[in-house]
A protein has these predicted regions:
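Phosphate-handling DNA/RNA-contact segment within nucleic-acid enzymes
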Residues: 1-97
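TOPRIM fold recognition
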Residues: 29, 56-59, 67-166
């Protein structure tokens, strides 16, 4: 049953591919999501708001759909901190030129590792959110303030950041 759940549809080129069911009343599991999309592929093949990759030159990468919705049309979600090779390939082959990575604070090393996979081909900026806060907690205005205070990073800078996290 999806009673008490907010349903967030995932479209790809105008076609419904997947959905998130997020509990908003507190009873039952936090999420009630399907294991696969309508084509039978698992969530590692899904990007929320995938179409933004072809529409914008700068795109924000978040973990969850609600975080992406907080940022707006230019944000995508990867369905978690562990980003699949398929998702990385989609980011690399897109028309987008700049990525702003906004993963949750517990995923800092994942964010830097994603940036390292992209930086040879795209401009990347890893924005570290304050401990205990995701994009949704901070809101759009505070998140964008952090984004504007962070500059794009080079491969060497990302290596230094990764080493400092270990």
């Amino acid at each position: 049953s999806t009673y008490g759940y907010l349903i967030i549809p995932f479209y790809y080129r105008g076609q419904l591919r997947y959905y998130n069911a997020r509990n908003v009343i507190g009873k039952g599991p936090r999420y009630n999501n399907p294991d696969k999309d309508i084509t039978g592929l698992g969530k590692q093949f899904i990007i929320f708001n995938h179409d933004a990759l072809e529409m914008y030159r700068s795109v924000f990468i978040c973990e969850g759909a609600l975080n992406a919705l907080t940022i707006g049309d230019r944000a995508i979600a990867t369905m978690g901190k562990a980003i699949s090779q398929y998702q990385v390939n989609e980011l690399l082959k897109s028309q987008c030129q700049r990525y702003i990575i906004l993963l949750d604070p517990d995923a800092r090393s994942y964010a830097v590792n994603l940036a390292l996979k992209l930086v040879a081909y795209k401009k990347v900026k890893v924005v570290f959110l304050p401990e205990g806060f995701d994009v949704n907690d901070l809101g759009k205005k505070q998140t964008l303030k952090l984004v504007y205070q962070t500059r794009y990073q080079s491969y060497q800078e990302l290596i230094q950041i990764r080493n400092s996290l270990e």
